[in-house]
Amino acid sequence: RGNYPVFKRNLRQWMMRITAYGKRLEDDLDTIDWPDKVRAMQRNWIGRSEGATVRFDVSGAPGAGSSPSVLEVYTTRPDTLFGATFMVVAPEHPILGGTAGGDADDEAALTLPQAWPEGTKNAWTGGAATPRQAVAAYRAQASAKSEAERVDEERTKTGVFTGLFGINPVNGQPVPVFVADYVLWGYGTGAIMAVPAHDDRDWAFA
């Protein structure tokens, strides 16, 4: 109310790791006397899928730092690895470093390059002078959006380049890493490999 800005803040809490029980929960649905429609709804909610976790080494981060040097992505189509043209991480992903989204000192705490890599396209920078400025500004914007707004399929996909590159493990090619709010930190690994030829959201972002 009153058009005051709303920001998300990270809080310590415990959560049940439902994914660890996904197979058991789904298998046990066959042992209970529920209507087929309800069991189908439960299976959709559990959302178990078959796939592979792929690790991309990350280059471009400034030497020492607490940020991880590997990005993990989950894919149901490992055969599309050769078609990955970029990667996208959630604004809250620890590879970026930083503080809670929207904090004034977020830019200084980001573990990103201090200058744009040579050949960076202007359209990737969000009009910022450095990757840290671009990502800090984008994280502040993303923190003011609800999860429903972020995953709205009708919304124009936005994002900025982080200055980092993931190394494709199958061919050794570097692929740029972007930050975008349509990727959620609480879903999967909080990072995706983007294959525009096989995914509508990746195509829209590209």
Give the role of each language-model region.
Residues R1-F205:
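NTP-handling and nucleic-acid-processing catalytic cores
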